């Protein structure tokens, strides 16, 4: 099991659970109906009774449900990627590795460009390795230290 994506998904679920607000207002913002004073709103200055509609989108736990659905979709995508990797699909070459596209330069009839001036990394500034997994591991370590993540 690849722990970096699992840690990221656990962090997403923990953040959705901890940041879920029961006082979140559902639906579209702003006054609607008689509170706006439109044609159907009755006379101006008349006492109005504000009827609060049932919460739909901002109900407690809805962001947790969305995060759980996202985690399930991510798990399904990860499982599909794992199955695809095991069934003959090739993995993309990482930084510093030579892939199949790099090897076609050396064969007779290759284009001869090589990984030098024509490479994407030569033309982009600061194209070093990404630091995403490090952040994920730090956050996963923090969750593990807090006892929220159990391997």
Curated annotation (Swiss-Prot):
Matches recorded under Pfam families: Shadoo (PF14999)
UniProt GO cellular component terms: cytosol; extracellular region; nucleolus; nucleus; plasma membrane; side of membrane; vesicle
Changes after translation: N-glycosylated.
Signal peptide extent: 1-24
Lipid-acceptor residues (GPI-anchor amidated glycine): 126
UniProt record, GO biological process: protein import into nucleus
Gene Ontology molecular function terms on file: nucleic acid binding
Expression across tissues: Mainly expressed in brain. In brain, it is expressed in hippocampus.
Known glycosylation sites: 111
Domain of life from the UniProt record: Eukaryota
Localization annotation: Cell membrane
Propeptide cleavage-removed residue intervals: 127-151
Keyword Disulfide bond: no
Similarity comment: family membership: Belongs to the SPRN family.
Function: Prion-like protein that has PrP(C)-like neuroprotective activity. May act as a modulator for the biological actions of normal and abnormal PrP.
Further facts: 'Shadoo' means 'shadow' in Japanese.
Name assigned to this protein: Shadow of prion protein
Species the sequence originates in: Homo sapiens (Human)
Gene for this chain: SPRN
């Amino acid at each position: 099991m690849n722990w970096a994506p699992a840690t990221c998904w656990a962090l997403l679920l923990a953040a959705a659970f901890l940041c879920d607000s029961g006082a979140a207002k559902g639906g579209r913002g702003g006054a609607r109906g008689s509170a706006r004073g439109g044609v159907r709103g009755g006379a101006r200055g008349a006492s109005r009774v504000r009827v609060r509609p049932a919460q739909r989108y901002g109900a407690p736990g809805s962001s947790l449900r969305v995060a759980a659905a996202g985690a399930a979709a991510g798990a399904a995508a990860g499982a599909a990627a794992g199955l695809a990797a095991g069934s003959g699909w090739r993995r993309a070459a990482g930084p510093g590795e030579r892939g199949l596209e790099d090897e076609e330069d050396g064969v007779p009839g290759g284009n001869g460009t090589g990984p030098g001036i024509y490479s994407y990394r030569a033309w982009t500034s600061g194209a070093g390795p990404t630091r995403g997994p490090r952040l994920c591991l730090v956050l996963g370590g923090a969750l593990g230290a807090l006892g929220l993540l159990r391997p």
